[in-house]
């Protein structure tokens, strides 16, 4: 039944990986952004990447341009650092279960079609970067799946030439992931 079984009084949705964290006051802050702005479908903020022990590796404060970049570049909107309106989530049909890794990118692209994606400069969550996580351990699959999602979201006339930018983007995303994994390994030693 999942989210559809929630009582009607639940107006907002955030989902958090079992090893990720919200920062103190993040939900209150995100709610304050959403509450006065009915046109906003999702609010997102910064996300601190931490290793398995909780040591800081990197701070993603991608800014408001992330909502535009996600259609043609890396997905920089942090899923644990976002809060969405339930009615917007339901309007787009919820998660597309054909995706295993990049379902959040697909979700964010579809949410952007029914409402505004709003950045807040506050750090809202912490994402634990370790090989055991689905996102990190399945990095190659995740990057490939995100490429499929971005290409499908393009106008039909651009899809045939998408490999011109998708190939270098995939390489950069994979290299960035390798660097974070190295930083995480060093922090544990």
Residue locations for each model-derived region?
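Nucleotide-sugar donor-binding/catalytic module of glycosyltransferases
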Residues: 1-139
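A general structural signal for well-ordered alpha-helical segments in protein cores
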Residues: 108, 143-146
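Membrane-proximal basic amphipathic "stem/tether" segments
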Residues: 147, 151-189
């Amino acid at each position: 039944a999942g989210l559809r079984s929630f009582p009607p009084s639940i107006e907002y949705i955030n989902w958090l990986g079992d090893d990720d964290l919200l920062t103190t006051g993040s939900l209150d802050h995100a709610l304050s952004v959403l509450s006065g702005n009915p046109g906003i479908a999702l609010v997102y903020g910064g996300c601190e990447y931490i290793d398995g022990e909780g040591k800081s590796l990197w701070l993603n404060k991608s800014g408001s341009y992330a909502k535009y970049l996600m259609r043609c570049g890396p997905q920089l909107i942090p899923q644990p650092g976002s809060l969405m309106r339930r009615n917007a989530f339901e309007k787009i049909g919820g998660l597309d279960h054909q995706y295993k890794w990049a379902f959040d990118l697909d979700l964010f692209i579809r949410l952007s079609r029914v409402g505004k994606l709003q950045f807040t400069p506050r750090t809202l969550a912490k994402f634990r970067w370790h090989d055991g996580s689905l996102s990190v351990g399945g990095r190659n699959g995740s990057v490939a799946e995100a490429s499929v999602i971005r290409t499908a979201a393009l106008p039909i006339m651009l899809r045939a030439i998408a490999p011109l930018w998708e190939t270098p983007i995939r390489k950069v995303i994979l290299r960035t992931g390798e660097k974070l994994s190295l930083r995480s390994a060093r922090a544990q030693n």
